[in-house]
Amino acid sequence: MQTMKANVFRGPNKIGIEEVPRPSAGVGEAVIRITLTTICGTDLHILRGEYPVKPGLVIGHEPVGVIEELGEGLSGYKIGDRVLVGAITPCGQCRACLSAQWAQCGHGEGVEAIGGWRFGNTINGAQAEYLLVPNAQANLAKIPDELSDEQVVLLADIASTGFSGAESANIRIGDTVAVFAQGPIGLCATAGAKLIGASLIIGVESDPVRMEMSKRMGAHVVLDPTQCDVVAEIKKLTGGGADVAIEALGLQVTFENALRCLRPGGTLSSLGVYSGKLQVPYDAFAAGLGDYKIVTTLCPGGKERMRRLMSMVQSKRFDPLPLLTHRFKLDQIVEAYTVFGSRREGCLKVAIMP
């Protein structure tokens, strides 16, 4: 039996590199040799026991690699093709997929599975030397020769999620947008709001490194919530309230502030992953009479979504490389989690290379 190195979750705060069986491709599946992956904030939730997955699972859900094996039923691919696979792997055939709700494919699978999020949730994930890709025809996106692995790895999740937060909010040309938290996803939401055409983008962040990166990604103003009343400042800057607020942290306080900073009829786009109960204060949405909209988003996946995101990088409309601040080998995965989780040395995202 062939084996490989992989980062295995063994319980809260217990991960590490182990030798595990190497996957083989069945019908409609492919095996890719991982050339680059990363760590997501959701992986931290898993590590801390805040999101339940089964012990023994290989975690990680942001894979870039080379096709090593193709199962029966696949066409248009060959061994050796460089591919990007989204964090969400839609089947392309179910009711959700046929309704263009790709992220909700297979809702209800596994242990509290969320839609089409399978890697590192219900099946083995990408922090390994090899990865089995289900529904490969719908999910293997070929990488253009002129793009490097580092240019595309963040498209699998944080760019797709952040952009989707802006898209789901239906930002219109000239809208005012406040983005709460400028972590990796919030920064991508800021970039997405800029690309769509917001006239004023207000970032909310207290970390100096992230405040500066927020401006680089497109924020016109960045407010430090430890130094001012951000709701009052946003209302002042926007003349009464933002058209759109994007919440990208997953805390009660940021959700509530995002709701309170809106104009009547405004939209709150929620991207954060919440660990506890979330409450909507009676007065924050005018007792239900303020025409507010609250929308939620799970990272869109599938090869067409990945192709579109890669085209944005290829045309130089979006540059994700500044977000990739640290690099580690797979054998250093525990250290990588520590650096990423503690934001040490201004860490935003880490590259993991087998």
Where are these regions (language model features)?
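C-terminal hydrophobic helical "lid"/dimerization subdomain
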Residues: M1-Q2, A6, G240, E256-R260, ...
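Glycine-rich beta-strand-centered segment in the early N-terminal region that forms part
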Residues: P21-T37, R48-L98, A103, I123-N124, ...
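Generic hydrophobic/aromatic pocket-lining and core-packing "Φ" positions
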Residues: D43, A166, T190, M211, ...
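NAD(P)H dinucleotide-binding glycine-rich loop of Rossmann-like/cofactor-binding domains
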Residues: G76, Q93-F180
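Mid-domain Rossmann-like dinucleotide-binding core that forms the NAD(H)/NADP(H) cofactor-binding site
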Residues: V83, K142-C228, A232-E233, V244
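A generic alpha-to-beta junction signature in SAM-dependent methyltransferases
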Residues: A169-I171, T238, L249, L262-R263, ...
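Glycine-rich phosphate-binding loop and adjacent beta-alpha segment
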Residues: A198, K215-R216, H220, Q252-F318, ...
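Short SAM/SAH-binding signature in class I
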Residues: G240-I246, G266
